[in-house]
Amino acid sequence: MPNTTSTYEPLVLVNTADLPEEEWLEYRRRGIGGSDAAAILGVSPFATARDLYYDKLKVVSYEDGESNWVQKKVGHLLEDLVAEIFHVKTGFEIYQVKKMFYHPVYTYMLADIDYFIRLPNGKTAILEIKTTNYNAKDHWWLSLIHI
């Protein structure tokens, strides 16, 4: 049984700063990211576990005919603004590390973190930006647990 009390430093899979989206998707297909958790557990309104499986194998991508592409595009465009608002309202220092990480033991576990927060005590925390409404929280909480 694995030791669940240990902490691990994540390893860098790839620098994502100038990575084209299609290449980013290829790296993402190598493992399971936070966005995949709800589909795996069968609670995602956007994809089933089979959709995800096919996407990972590049058989077919459930993202090809997305009906929610507008929400995703707007959400992506608003991420920096929401992070700035968070910074102004909390006073916490925020910063980005444009890299995709993986777990050193469970190498299939991937993370692409939106922002990091430097807390007043010097510790680092994760800021995952979601531009949605409160009623949709059940659709994204699993991705946060994955991190």
Regions found by a protein language model. Name each.
Residues 77, 81, 108-110, 122:
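Residues forming well-ordered secondary-structure scaffolds
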Residues 86, 113-136:
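Conserved catalytic cores of phosphodiester-cleaving nucleases, focusing on short active-site segments
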Residues 1-77:
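Charged, glycine-rich intrinsically disordered N-terminal tails and low-complexity linkers that flank
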Residues 65-66, 137-141:
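Short acidic, glycine/proline-rich loop/turn micro-motifs
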Residues 87-107, 114:
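A short acidic/basic microdomain associated with nuclease active sites
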Residues 42, 95-96, 126-128:
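A structural signal for short, well-ordered beta-strand segments and their strand-loop junctions
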Residues 72-96:
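Acidic-basic catalytic patches of nuclease active cores, encompassing PD-(D/E)XK
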Residues 145-147:
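Conserved small/polar residues in nucleotide/adenosyl-binding loops
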